């Protein structure tokens, strides 16, 4: 059993990050679903869809939900998903996804830590 991944982002941010990460990594080692939130979407409708995706993705190991900006509609929806085995990490960036991709056999808790580590490592003043 592998952890499922749900990307909940503004517009196509998640789609583009996933495409780029898959291209760099060479493959996508997880079962992933994308949920794009646009300004015309109704939050309750999106939350209902997010919960359906989580149920679909959870093979027993749980679901890691990655979202872009904390405190915005996508992250608020992600943090309100009602499911027992879920971890939500905000601040999505390419480094975060790539770091998660490196650990497909890790547990949900371990992957949430890897997501945080990857996200932080991808931010630097140069």
Q: Where in the sequence are the language-model features?
A:
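N-terminal loops that bind phosphate or other acidic moieties
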Residues: 2-64, 69-126
